[in-house]
Amino acid sequence: SFNRPFYLDRCLQSIESFVEGDFCVKVLDDGTPETYLSKIKEKHPKIEIIKSENYQNKIAAIAENLQSGKEIDGFTIPTNLWYKAAKNASDYFMMIEDDVWFTHKINVNDLQEICKKNQISLLKLGWLGNKKDDEFVEISEITEEILRVEPKNLLLFPEFFNDLFFYNKFKFFTILYKLGIVDNSTKQKY
C-alpha cells in the first residue's frame, strides 16, 4: 500500500467480511503516514504491518508534496519488500493490492487445495475486466474461478537491463518516460 489508507481499510474490511479459512494478513506499506497506519491497526488488530526500506523517504516526499507541490517520484517501487514477503511466506499465499476488494465469499483453505492440485505457488486476485490489458496477455481457465494469465511478450533481459527498464536504475525508465518513448502502461506489455 502507498498512501491510500481508505483503499487499504476497505480492502481489509472486505477480507474480514468475505474471506474464510486459516490465514493471516500482512500489509506491505510503502509510505502511508503513521497517523493512518495507527488507525488501521486499531481497527484491524489482527493484521501485521511491514514497512518498506523506502518508507521514511516516501513519508518525507508526501510531506514535501503537500507543502510545496513537488512531484512524488512514482518510479521507486518496493520490489525488495514484495520479494522478501513472498520468499518468507507459506507455500501458498495470496498477494492482493489495496484497491482490490472481495465482494463474494471465498475460502482460502479451498483455494489452497486448488493451488496444490494445479501446482500454483502464487495466486494474485484481481479484476480481469480491463480489455485494454487483455491484448498483452494470454488468458486460459484453470478452474471455473481461477484464470491463468501469461504475458504474450515476456522480456528476458540480462539482469543489468532488467534493472534499467523495470527497476528504473540510473533513472533510465524516467528518462525514457520524459522523452515520450515509454508511458505508464509500457511495462504491462511485458
Which stretches of residues belong to each language-model region?
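Active-site beta-to-alpha loop of glycosyltransferases that engages the nucleotide-sugar donor
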Residues: 1-10, 31
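Short, acidic, metal-binding catalytic loop of nucleotide-sugar glycosyltransferases
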Residues: 13-22
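Short beta-strand/loop segment that forms part of the nucleotide-sugar
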Residues: 22-32, 50-54
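Active-site-proximal specificity loops/subdomain of glycosyltransferases
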Residues: 36-89
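Short beta-strand-to-loop acidic/aromatic patch adjacent to the donor-nucleotide binding site
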Residues: 91-101
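Conserved donor-nucleotide/metal-binding helix-loop-beta segment in metal-dependent transferases, i.e.
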Residues: 105-129
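Short, flexible, basic/aromatic active-site loop/helix in glycosyltransferases
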Residues: 139-157
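Catalytic core and acceptor-binding pocket of nucleotide-sugar-dependent glycosyltransferases
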Residues: 151-190
